[in-house]
């Protein structure tokens, strides 16, 4: 009997020691519930977003642990490569006390209009991706780039009658940057302003010159007045856009045809190239870039500076890669909207066949002569220069296959209907 009691006491003592150790372990602050009780686990996804994965216990759940400190990312000064950020400015102005660098933030995504029927009877498969238009005497193809929403645009006005029986036709290709606000405004306003100003200048010039000068002198004065009217229309459009206080900008290449005269104007790096019957390409515009010597001197003479980063791209105030454009209020002191205009007499040069207007998404990969050759070849297989959109589509495809990542817009204008009979 005594022996049985001793054994029972020993068992109770052992159990007590085990329970005591267990209680000490549970009460210790070093004890971890991981793997024992289903507490929330936080996994960090890309961009600093938190994703909660729950493993719930059927019986009990401890409160979640304290949230980790917020992840703070450094602010980016401008949208360029690390190599370009490190590259020193090579301009002569850069070495001397230049103004502080201007920061132009990247544009937020902009909703793009849905596809539909083009007013010229063309087909718009998806405005955000591609546009194809076959209109009266012209064709167009546009392809969105891979970096952002489509920022190219175009405008066409045909059969605009003015006093004296003359008719005007206007064609334009536009390349926006910093969002769609500027390119949409320019596409809507510039053509109307150019046609209105040119018509008014023609009428006034004819009234003033009536009976006071020879026909040849009168014609020269009228041509000068039309050129001045185009300039005024560009500057007026720019002023109207700036008055809205909206950010962004746009480049342009436009053509006005009147009485057998072709007036081609541009700001920025949109380009116009003339194709002859003999297949010769002639550039009628010169790209406005900070790397152009006369543009650099103009900018520096007004207190600005230009620089070239590691990517080889020249920029105004370390920000903008074109030296003339609509909009761009932050650098307007140096980035003017003063157009350069070239005039070609279609009557005197009956060799003119077509005109190629395009954004720099084409010209960065396709040469002037290649563009003319492609249009001529496609026109030979189709019903004339503007008989289909094939010439424009082939040029856009050529630029894309060679690595162009920008928006590409190509317009081909048939000049033969404007030649004198």
From Swiss-Prot:
Family per similarity comment: Belongs to the PP2C family.
Single Gene Ontology BP annotation: signal transduction
Catalysis: reaction(s): O-phospho-L-seryl-[protein] + H2O = L-seryl-[protein] + phosphate; O-phospho-L-threonyl-[protein] + H2O = L-threonyl-[protein] + phosphate
Binding locations of Mn(2+) 2: 175, 360, 406
EC number(s) on file: 3.1.3.16
Free-text cofactor note: Binds 2 magnesium or manganese ions per subunit.
Cross-referenced SMART domains: PP2C_SIG, PP2Cc
Metal-binding keyword on record: yes
Lineage: Eukaryota, Viridiplantae, Streptophyta, Embryophyta, Tracheophyta
PANTHER family to which the protein is assigned, alphabetical: PROTEIN PHOSPHATASE (PTHR47992)
One MF annotation (Gene Ontology) recorded for this entry: protein serine/threonine phosphatase activity
Region (Disordered): 46-69, 203-225
Disulfide-bond pairs as recorded: none
Protein's organism: Oryza sativa subsp. japonica (Rice)
Annotated protein name in UniProt: Probable protein phosphatase 2C 77
Domain PPM-type phosphatase: 137-415
Binding positions (Mn(2+) 1): 175-176
Entry cofactors: Mg(2+); Mn(2+)
Pfam families per UniProt: PP2C
Sorted UniProt keywords: Hydrolase, Magnesium, Manganese, Metal-binding, Protein phosphatase
